[in-house]
Every structure is written in structure tokens, then in C-alpha cells.
Amino acid sequence: VENRILQLALWQQFAQCANLTLLCPARLQSLQRADNAWQLTLDGGETLQTRLVVGADGANSQVRKLAAIGTNGWQYRQACMLITVDTGAPQQDVTWQRFFPSGPRAFLPLYDSWASLVWYDSPQRIRQLQAMPPAQLEREIATAFPARLGPVKVHAAGSFPLTRRHAQRYVLPG
């Protein structure tokens, strides 16, 4: 499911919850224990008190950092490139993945003729691909992906290193 579709569904559900107060946009500035509860201070100076804080704010979690919960992890010797492409033809709801010695490559249909390509490889190779102009990247895709993909038009691309990371604690009493 595309991120924007998921976000839209969440916002629509939020609108139907009478007991939900959205504090948006707001950033968490501090988090402190206070009498079997947590006191949160937001960037606008507002303070909140709650018995439960859920840190679901990503790999570089501000909640985890403010709660002084460390992480263990390491970098894999791989990186991943996500490439948004137009295939020029409507896509069926078919996803595929092929495995290569350098890492998997996958096709994820989005909507109409749009799709995401996922390319795992060495960090050096991904940096090389990221530096290519779209026309050159399209030629590399034609060479590296199965022929059934057909020609594509690159519209956006991004990459990130693959990292394994686990919190040292997953529960911290308030």
C-alpha cells in the first residue's frame, strides 16, 4: 500500500474519533518521568501528562532518544535504491522479485502505469546508479531487470544504506 494512501486512510479515521485530539504539527522537545506517568513538552511549550508513550517515530526516534533507550546494530554491506518509474502501460496487481548474487531486485506496481523498482546492491554500485542521469539509469534498468519489465521512464529515485538496528529496551515503565 502506498504511503500516501495509508496516510489518507489514517487521517480519515482520525476525523471520526471523538476522543482523539491531534496535536499537529508539533514536535516532542522533552520527555520526563513524573509520578508513574510521563510528562511531554512540545515545541510550542505545551505540556502533556500520560501513562503511555508509544515511540513509533522511525529509525531515528526522538522518543527513544529522549527516553535514553540505546540501540544495537550494524551496517550491512548493501544499499537499496528505490526508483519510481512509468512503464507506459497499466500494471496488473503483480509483484515480483529476483535474486542475484549482489542482492534482490523487485517490481512493485503502484497505480495506472506507475511502479517502484527496488534494487539492492553494494553501496558503491548504488552510489554510481544514483549519480546517473535518468536516461542512463533507464538503460541500466533495461540491462539489470528482467526483459518482461519492458522500457521504463524514470521519474524519481532515492537510496539508503541497509542497517540493522534494535532498541536495547522495548518497554520502559512510567
Spans of model-derived segments:
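Short FAD-binding loop at a beta-strand-to-alpha-helix junction that anchors the flavin cofactor
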Residues: R169-G174
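Conserved N-terminal helical subregion
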Residues: V1-L66, W74-A79
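Conserved FAD-binding catalytic core of PHBH/FMO-like flavoproteins
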Residues: A56-L162, H166-A167
